[in-house]
Amino acid sequence: MNTTIKEAKQYIGQEVTIGAWLTNKRSSGKIAFLQLRDGTGFIQGVVAKAEVDEEIFQKAKEITQESSLYVTGVISEDNRSDIGYEMQVKSIEVISEAHDYPITPKNHGTEFLMDHRHLWLRSKKQHAVMKIRNEIIRATYEFFNDNGFTKIDPPILTASAPEGTSELFHTKYFDQDAFLSQSGQLYMEAAAMAHGRVFSFGPTFRAEKSKTRRHLIEFWMIEPEMAFCEHAQSLEVQEQYVTHVVKSVLNHCKLELKALDRDTSKLEKVTTPFPRITYADAVIFLKEQGFDDIEWGEDFGAPHETAIANHYDLPVFITNYPTKIKPFYMQPNPENEDTVLCADLIAPEGYGEIIGGSERINDLELLEERLSQFELDAESYSYYLDLRRYGSVPHSGFGLGLERTVAWLSGVEHVRETAPFPRLLNRLYP
């Protein structure tokens, strides 16, 4: 019977065949231990010299790392195993033998591993990170579908940009100038006026010459927009969504979190409501903590965000940033018009901002004024202005960066490990 490693637990005491790759092996003279993977999981195959033909035992000792195999044997319970079972191997068929596999069990440098990213993905830890990424995506669709959101796909090639100060990737669109999208937000606002509650999930591109552990050139964003939704309501949706994702990963990725040696105690504390601190109070807090490199009106850097998050040891909203350091489309704060109705959600443990969101300006004259203040061409945003001409309503939205969220939940140090094939400042291959 052919099966997968994940499904093999249904066949305790039965003989099955599994297609797999050999990740590692060891031998103690009369027994060979094969570490096998098939994409659904990892299992140990035990080859006892006394129970198989000499040819099979010799083959087990000689198989090379990452060779592909059909392995037949009896599934037996093993309480020492992470999955609770192993295979007593009876026969081995080599499909394709791998020669001189470059990523050996020894330690390798980061650049070497990134040069071989197409192979590094096969390792147990990288496999675990991608499974957690997949679960975050699955839980995202589950949350928004269950809460009445419609999935909308904004274009990747655009004529204008929502973040006026960010660097863009320029290309030619026949005889016109075009840019790779840095956010689908403006289009999602239009979609929200048709469907009420919408979300998108897709790639975004930012030509920022940054080499920090938090930045990728190409990354994926989840971007919901909600009509008839004010800032406070949006914060509630954000914390409900993040809590749902965290609980889903904890429930469905136990083996992956264990493979990564992730301490889940802090993730288990994540629940609504999240703490909130205004930008102004955050500046005061930082000064009290000895930071003398921040003044009101300046944006926070990674050390500042980490200090704030460490104080709460939970995801924390920093609200009401100064108008001058945020994009043009954010609704003024009626209690202080030098600030806007916005929030960044900062993940604990030093992972930084994972969500940026705001209530959007819904008044036409104010939006036109802001475009002028930010020295943006109003004609390029004519369709965006139309949304305020024809039935404008209070509306809010946010964007969650997938890779930073994966890094936080999986506990990896650098976001380069959270994308299958990351695009970094000096890396476009593989």
Swiss-Prot record:
**Which cellular compartments is it found in?**
Cytoplasm
Q: What is its EC number?
A: 6.1.1.22
Q: Which SUPFAM superfamilies does the annotation name?
A: Class II aaRS and biotin synthetases, Nucleic acid-binding proteins
Q: Name one GO biological process term.
A: asparaginyl-tRNA aminoacylation
GO CC aspect terms: cytoplasm
Does Flavoprotein count among this protein's keywords? no
What is this enzyme's catalytic activity, as reactions? tRNA(Asn) + L-asparagine + ATP = L-asparaginyl-tRNA(Asn) + AMP + diphosphate + H(+)
* Chief place of localization: cytoplasm
A GO molecular function term, named singly, is: asparagine-tRNA ligase activity
Q: What class of enzyme is it?
A: ligase
InterPro entries reported for this sequence: Aa-tRNA-synt_II (IPR004364), aa-tRNA-synth_II (IPR006195), aa-tRNA-synth_II/BPL/LPL (IPR045864), Asn-tRNA-ligase (IPR004522), Asp/Asn-tRNA-synth_IIb (IPR002312), NA-bd_OB-fold (IPR012340), NA-bd_OB_tRNA (IPR004365)
**Record keywords, A-Z:** Aminoacyl-tRNA synthetase, ATP-binding, Cytoplasm, Ligase, Nucleotide-binding, Protein biosynthesis
Report quaternary structure and partners. Answer: Homodimer.
Can you tell me which family this protein belongs to? Belongs to the class-II aminoacyl-tRNA synthetase family.
This chain belongs to the protein called Asparagine--tRNA ligase
Q: Which gene encodes it?
A: asnS
